Amino acid sequence: MGPKLLESRLCLLLLLGLVLMLASCQAQILSQKFYTQHIYNSTYPRCDAVMRVVNRYRPRCKDINTFLHTSFADVVAVCGHPNITCNNLTRKNCHASSFQVFITFCNLTMPTRICTQCRYQTTGSVKYYRVACENRTPQDTPMYPVVPVHLDGTF
C-alpha cells in the first residue's frame, strides 16, 4: 500500500506541475505574440523564412499572416487613437492607424507535417491597419500602459 500511495502522490504532484506549466504557456504574453506574428521592421522578408518563427509555436502551419513593417512603439501609439469596433463586431477595443505602412502578406501554398518546412507566397503592399489593444499585463514592459494584442485587419 505504501509504494502505491507514494506513486499516486508523485503522479499527482507531477500532474499539478504539468498543469501549472501548461497554464503559464497558455498565458503567453499576448503583446509578445503580436510582436512575433506581426512586426517586421526591416526590408521585405521571404515568408518561408519568417513564418518558421511564427509556426514554431503552433501545431500546424498558419494559413495566412500579415507583417507590418513598422516598430512596436509605432503600433503602441496607434493604441492611443480613438476606439472603433473590431471586425468581429463584439469588441470595441480596436484602433486604426492614421498612416499607411509597408506590409508583407504570407499565404500558405504548401503545408507540411513539419511546421518549419511549410511554403508561403509572399506579397507586398502599402496599407493602413487596425489593431486590438488591451491594458498591459504584469509581464509586459511598464513602458507601455496599453499594448497591441491582435492585428484586426489591413485596409
UniProtKB/Swiss-Prot annotation:
SUPFAM superfamilies, per this entry?
RNase A-like
Positions of modified residues (3'-nitrotyrosine): Y57
- Catalytic activity annotation: an [RNA] containing cytidine + H2O = an [RNA]-3'-cytidine-3'-phosphate + a 5'-hydroxy-ribonucleotide-3'-[RNA]; an [RNA] containing uridine + H2O = an [RNA]-3'-uridine-3'-phosphate + a 5'-hydroxy-ribonucleotide-3'-[RNA]
- State the signal peptide span: 1-25
Q: Which residues cross the membrane?
A: none
Spell out the InterPro entries in the cross-references. RNaseA, RNaseA-like_dom_sf, RNaseA_AS, RNaseA_domain
Residues that bind substrate, according to the entry?
A: K33, K62, D63, I64, N65, T66
Q: What is this protein's gene name?
A: Rnase2
Residues annotated as glycosylated: N41, N83, N88, N107
By sequence similarity, the record places it as follows: Belongs to the pancreatic ribonuclease family.
- The lineage's top-level taxon is Eukaryota
Q: Which organism is it from?
A: Mus musculus
Q: Name one GO molecular function term.
A: ribonuclease A activity
Q: How does it assemble?
A: Interacts with and forms a tight 1:1 complex with RNH1. Dimerization of two such complexes may occur.
- Which PROSITE patterns does this chain map to? RNASE_PANCREATIC (PS00127)
Q: Which residues does the entry assign to the active site, renumbered to this chain? A: H38 (proton acceptor), H150 (proton donor)
| Official protein name in the record | Non-secretory ribonuclease
Give an example GO cellular component term for this record: lysosome
Write out the function statement from the record. This is a non-secretory ribonuclease. It is a pyrimidine specific nuclease with a slight preference for U. Cytotoxin and helminthotoxin. Possesses a wide variety of biological activities.
Which EC number(s) are documented for this chain?
4.6.1.18
The disulfides recorded in the entry are: C47-C106, C61-C118, C79-C133, C86-C94
User: What keywords tag this UniProt record?
Assistant: Disulfide bond, Endonuclease, Glycoprotein, Hydrolase, Lyase, Lysosome, Nitration, Nuclease, Signal
